[in-house]
Design a protein with these regions (language model features):
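Alpha-carbonic anhydrase
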Residues: 2-271
Length: 271
């Protein structure tokens, strides 16, 4: 695995702030808070994937400057000829959860999980707990320039606040799909939440194959904070065409274009 760039104080603070915002609905907290949990006086501006889309994110707010100036941005085009390092495998330890809370946050459909839910990944011997997962359409990552129908990002946080994301590519195909219980009841109105009773087996959302791409990158939405450990599973998972259409009716497109690698290495592990 290539040596990663050390975390910069401002970068890790931005990552923590972004994760704090992501988990607010699950924690039941009110108001906007900064990385320390104190009320924040700075309110991030509106952004989207259209007029105020990826090409303009850095112009919307000082905290979004990394979206333009960063050198380890995500998503990326994953090379099919990536260096094979089977021992660099990210361990995925997923099980069922009793319930999830779905929220339409105006950018995607996000599923927030209860704390201490027992689902985690282990990256370089560091455990990361699953906090939430959300969707993009079409996929954000591509492989040799080819994308898929959708992509789901499972967002994890370590005990020290570092962030690791597991990306799963989704391809529309007939038949059963582990995403049906989520996408079939996604809230249509912004800022509306709905509780999905379980059990929900997260393993049904993963491919059977274990090949995975690993690289160092960033959040794919503002503030685009870097220092994020990425694992993208190489084999797509089926999503029912009707469920993809339901999501498309809410968000016709919700993907950031691929970003330059800028000399970063991509490792193919677990193959």
């Amino acid at each position: 695995m290539p040596t990663s760039t050390p975390f910069r104080p401002r970068s890790i603070a931005a990552v923590l702030a972004a994760v704090a915002v992501l988990v607010l609905p699950a924690c039941g907290s009110g108001g906007q808070r900064g990385p320390t949990g104190e009320p924040s006086t700075h309110h991030a501006p509106h952004w989207d994937y259209d007029a105020e889309g990826p090409d303009h994110w850095a112009d919307l707010d000082r905290d979004f400057l990394t979206c333009k100036s960063g050198h380890q941005q995500s998503p990326v085009d994953l090379p099919g000829h990536a260096r094979l390092e089977p021992h660099e495998h990210t361990t995925v330890d997923y099980h069922s959860v009793p319930t999830v809370t779905l929220r339409n946050n105006g950018h995607t459909v996000q599923a927030n999980l209860p704390t201490h839910n027992g689902n985690r990944i282990v990256v370089d011997d560091v455990p990361f707990e699953l906090v939430q997962f959300h969707f993009h359409l079409p996929s954000e990552h591509t492989v040799d320039g080819v994308g898929t129908t959708m992509e789901v990002h499972f967002v994890h946080k370590s005990a020290t606040g570092q962030v690791a994301v597991l990306g799963v590519l989704l391809r529309a195909a007939p038949g059963p799909s582990g995403f049906a219980p989520i996408l079939s009841v996604a809230p249509r109105a912004v800022d509306v939440e709905t509780v999905v009773p379980g059990p929900i087996d997260l393993r049904s959302m993963l491919p059977g194959a274990t090949d995975q791409y690993r690289y160092q990158g960033s959040l794919t939405t503002p503030p685009c904070s870097e220092g994020v450990s990425w694992t993208v599973l190489g084999s797509p998972v089926a999503v029912a065409p009707a469920d993809a259409d339901r999501y498309r009716a809410l968000f016709s497109h919700s993907n950031r274009p691929t970003q330059p690698l800028n000399g970063r290495s991509v490792t193919l592990a677990g193959g």
